[in-house]
Amino acid sequence: MDEEYIREMFGEGTQAMRMNYYPPCPQPDKVIGLTSHSDVVSLTILLQINQMEGLQIKKDGVWIPIIPLPHAFIINIGDILEVNKYDATVAFPFKKNLNYQIVTNAAYRSIEHRAVVNSEKERLSIATFYSTKIDRQIGPAPSIISAKNLAKFRSIEAADYVRGYFARKLDKRSYLDVMRIENSENPAS
């Protein structure tokens, strides 16, 4: 994949940070900290501050708790990386460069996750979201699409995708299904 394509897509991209506080709840089975969703962004980096369990991912229809490790980051691939497919090393603008090989168009998948609360202890986390420039067209990289590897997603301007994502109810996997191309010749669609 052309390095210039990566720079154009992610250089001067958007970055946001969110601090999450989940207070203790005496009846945790009756509430949810954050409903099930996948992240709209390209990449999410999460630090679970007080080592309290609460983040869960969905695998094969089952919710699996993510056990916090001291001083460790959790990296989530977001919907935009699932849509764009290319093979390259990307340097993200953090204190140290995060080299990350991105190979997607559904080869790497954004993950459905949620946060649950604890009956006795609060949970704290900080999430950093990194994404493309908002005025960029997102979709499978043209150099990756071929007769054998058909596009699984349509292209859309990043701003329109983000607007659509936030306009919907935060429920289930993702807004990504809106972009999915129904293609009978492509069994992975």
Identify the role of each PLM range.
Residues 1-189:
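C-terminal flanking tails of non-heme Fe-dependent oxygenases
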